[in-house]
């Protein structure tokens, strides 16, 4: 018997039914992770997980019930097969069993940029009625993994989540949870949303954010900073199309500078002394990402103090370690009748939440939320 049998949800036969929009590398790592950690002991400290049991829900209580894509090499396949098709190339952590869930053809809208169109064949199958499919699958939470720049497509799926009575987890930098108009739509519908733009487990954003804040805490003025990122997956190839990058650059930049108070770059997004964003595509890196970060400050006696570091990660597992909590937070919020942005989860797990909080405060609030406190 699996160790998760002691989770409150498992004892009552409750699950977190998720629908995944975009069956790419990130989705692959998430679904493989569900298999990898399904037998994790609830009371153990498990490498790679912040919470083996999140509220009532163990990792094993998360079930994939629907999937949507536009890639001809994925549509019509079982999710388990589709996740190892097309341009997917992330590191493998577990074998995914046959799930009995067919990938449906979703509407494209603006989801395929120029480089995607050059790399994949768009499915000729007629798009399905997404709302009807979500209801049929009895989905609780819709997870949007659409490519960067999919503004219209992401909003379409957010509306579908509302119409189907689902919570929504917005993993990409399209501003929905942080948009007052969209936040109100979810409040009016009585449904929760967590967003925007997933903050990886230990990625360039969280390390840069923490170190920038450390400069200020230790009395060093942060005068200028930069973060350059290169990777070899379809996300980075897609971002070669600079027109699709604007929201991504804003999201990554404000995630760092919003955590500052007194430095010249505090709160800045468009400033010559702050440069943060994706930089280039290097195909042989595959799903790895390399980040080069530099912080320049003024310390005691106005003496220069500079810090440089390089971070190497597998991009998709790094995000899955956060999404695995986000979907359970969304389900808890749904169970409790929380409407609108789930502030605690959004602030700790996302780059561009409705409210930016210091990470220690956000973490404390998230734990309070898990235990039944604030939303």
Can you say where each PLM-predicted feature lies in the sequence?
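Rossmann-fold dehydrogenase core element
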Residues: 185-198, 219, 223
């Amino acid at each position: 018997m699996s160790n998760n049998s002691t989770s409150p949800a498992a004892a009552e036969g409750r699950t977190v039914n998720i629908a995944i929009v975009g069956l790419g590398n990130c989705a692959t790592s998430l679904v493989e992770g569900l298999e990898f950690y399904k037998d994790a002991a609830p009371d153990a400290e498990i490498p790679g997980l912040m919470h083996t049991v999140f509220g009532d829900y163990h990792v094993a209580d998360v079930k994939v019930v629907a999937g949507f894509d536009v890639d001809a090499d994925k549509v019509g396949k079982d999710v388990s097969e589709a996740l190892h098709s097309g341009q997917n190339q992330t590191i493998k952590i577990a074998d995914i069993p046959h799930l009995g869930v067919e990938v449906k053809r979703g509407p494209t809208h603006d989801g395929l940029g120029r480089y995607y169109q050059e790399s994949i064949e768009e499915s000729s199958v007629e798009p399905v009625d997404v709302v009807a499919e979500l209801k049929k699958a009895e989905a609780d939470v819709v997870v949007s993994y659409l490519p960067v720049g999919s503004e219209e497509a992401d909003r379409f799926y957010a509306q579908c989540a509302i119409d189907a009575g689902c919570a929504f987890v917005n993993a990409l930098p399209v501003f929905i949870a942080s948009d007052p108009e969209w936040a109100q739509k979810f409040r009016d519908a009585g449904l929760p949303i967590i967003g925007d733009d997933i903050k990886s487990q230990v990625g360039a954003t969280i390390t840069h954010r923490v170190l920038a804040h450390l400069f200020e805490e230790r009395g060093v003025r942060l005068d200028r900073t930069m973060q350059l990122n290169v990777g070899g997956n379809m996300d980075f190839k897609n971002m070669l199309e600079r027109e699709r990058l604007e929201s991504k650059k804003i999201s990554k930049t404000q995630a760092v500078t919003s955590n500052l108070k007194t430095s010249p770059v505090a709160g800045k997004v468009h400033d010559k002394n702050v440069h943060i964003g994706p930089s280039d595509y290097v195909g042989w890196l595959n799903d790895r990402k390399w980040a080069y970060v530099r912080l320049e400050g003024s310390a005691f006696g106005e003496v220069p103090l500079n810090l440089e570091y390089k971070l190497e990660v597998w991009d998709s597992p790094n995000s899955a370690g956060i999404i695995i909590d986000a979907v359970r937070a969304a389900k808890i919020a749904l169970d409790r009748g929380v409407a609108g942005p789930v502030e605690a989860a959004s602030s700790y797990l996302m780059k561009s939440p409705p409210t930016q909080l210091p990470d220690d405060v956000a973490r404390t609030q998230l734990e309070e939320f898990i235990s039944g406190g604030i939303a």
